[in-house]
């Protein structure tokens, strides 16, 4: 059962898939339809799942699952990863590459590979106050306080040495 993102519980499990390229408005419409179709058929051991999704900043696909009603099984998570891989192929983007790092400078979002991110740190274009996206969070409640955070408070800080 699909619900609005703001209606799903704060303790819902989330998955964040970050694109290495900005999605256009036309692409977002198509992607939202694809996500809707996938979520309508997404089950765990035959049980319907209470789910929600959103696309944030034209880069991030966020899928939420209310685990109070049903838990995702390994097979259901595999189906989601397969779905995400299909989106990668269809739109020519990377959504599963955890070595792409996203950050904000002057409210503009940038995506860099790990090497470029480290180079920007050395060039002093990125510092401890730079806002980074911690896509490793896994609860909806963490989107508010733990997703967009200063580099100094994220796992990314280990890259500054």
Tell me the role of every PLM-derived stretch:
Residues 1-4, 161:
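Short, Lys/Arg-enriched, disordered terminal segments
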Residues 3, 10-56:
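Long, hydrophobic N-terminal alpha-helical segment
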Residues 14-18, 60-64, 100-102:
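Ordered hydrophobic segments in well-structured contexts
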Residues 22, 69-71, 104:
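Short histidine/acidic/glycine/proline-rich micro-motifs that form metal-
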Residues 48-62, 66-71:
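Short, intrinsically disordered low-complexity segments
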Residues 50-52, 90-100:
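Short, flexible active-site-proximal loops enriched in glycine and acidic residues
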Residues 66-95:
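Helix-adjacent hinge/juxtasegments
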Residues 96-161:
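Terminal interaction module
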